[in-house]
């Protein structure tokens, strides 16, 4: 564990002295962990009461100290920490989006009342370089249905060519799906930024499909709170597509609708019905 240097410790009932820490390398959007050794340097015990009482948490700040994520997940103490007692705690840490330079500020919070920093204690602030979620930009493909020459031609024009070996993300298309040239780049950009699932906009050829798929029409921008399943999604390892409106889909969390990643869709002729 890395030793923490000297820092101000107030006199009073609520005070913390940080002794040491160990931090797993954060990646954008990925749940990691940290181990902290800290001392109750005040005169009052710390007691966690389920989700209330004294909890360990953190803020993600930008390099200037502005809050990017104010409320990190809470970690309760398994038992009361008495004045003068030193404990080690393992805490979950969720990497912020997008990757980049941040400051990770650990603090204690008296839930629904105040952070210890607000009553004079110093948080443990660490400079952190958050890495992209994916270590390599390698996009593979699963084609649902029969091979299609026009789809194959569109894939051959991609700004970032698709790979067959060791992909880190896999996109799901159907025959007659014609991605725009920047489609693969935009999917990989979003995965790097921290999303496990990314789906683009659908631009159908037929009027019937345009009405049916109006919620996925181009022009919607980027939306991490999209109210519909992603269609023709790109998924990181371990995620599998389902089916919605006869197309491969994904309806889980940790997902982004990328309205600039456009896939033109021929009429249903030659595609699986569903």
Feature map (PLM): residue ranges:
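Short beta-strand and strand-turn-strand segments in soluble, beta-rich domains
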Residues: 15-18, 53, 57-77, 120
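Asparagine-centered strand-capping/turn motif at beta-strand->loop junctions
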Residues: 38-44
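Low-complexity, acidic Ser/Thr/Pro/Gly-rich terminal tails and inter-domain linkers that flank the onset
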Residues: 2-28, 125
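Short, surface-exposed loop/turn segments at beta-strand-coil junctions that are enriched for proline
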Residues: 94-100
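A recurrent flexible, glycine/aromatic-enriched loop bordering the glycosyltransferase active site
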Residues: 216-238, 243-259, 263-272
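Short beta-strand-to-loop acidic/aromatic patch adjacent to the donor-nucleotide binding site
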Residues: 165-180
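Conserved donor NDP-sugar-binding/catalytic core segment of glycosyltransferases
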Residues: 178-213
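N-proximal low-complexity "stem/linker" segments adjacent to membrane-targeting elements
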Residues: 131-157
């Amino acid at each position: 564990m890395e030793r923490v240097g000297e820092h101000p410790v107030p006199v009073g009932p609520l005070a913390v002295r940080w002794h040491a820490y160990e931090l797993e390398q954060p990646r954008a959007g990925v749940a990691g962990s940290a181990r902290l050794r800290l001392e109750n340097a005040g005169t009052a015990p710390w007691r966690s009461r389920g989700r209330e009482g004294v909890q360990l948490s953190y803020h993600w700040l930008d390099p200037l100290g502005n809050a990017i994520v104010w409320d990190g997940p809470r970690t309760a103490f398994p038992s009361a920490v008495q004045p003068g007692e030193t404990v080690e705690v393992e805490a979950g840490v969720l990497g912020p989006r997008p990757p980049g330079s941040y400051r990770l500020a650990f603090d204690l919070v008296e839930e629904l009342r105040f952070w210890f920093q607000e009553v004079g204690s110093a948080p443990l602030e660490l400079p952190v370089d958050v890495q992209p979620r994916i270590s390599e930009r390698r996009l593979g493909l699963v084609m649902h249905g029969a091979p299609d020459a026009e789809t194959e031609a569109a894939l051959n024009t991609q700004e970032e060519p698709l790979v067959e070996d060791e992909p880190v993300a896999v996109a799901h298309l159907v025959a007659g799906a014609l991605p725009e040239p920047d489609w693969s780049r935009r999917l990989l950009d979003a995965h790097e930024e921290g999303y496990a699932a990314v789906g683009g906009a659908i631009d159908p050829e037929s009027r019937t499909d345009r009405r049916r798929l109006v919620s996925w029409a181009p022009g919607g921008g980027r939306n991490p709170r999209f109210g519909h399943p992603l269609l023709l999604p790109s998924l990181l390892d371990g995620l599998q597509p389902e089916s919605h409106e006869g197309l491969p889909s994904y309806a889980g969390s940790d997902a982004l609708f990328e309205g600039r990643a456009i896939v033109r869709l021929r009429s249903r002729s030659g595609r699986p019905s569903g």
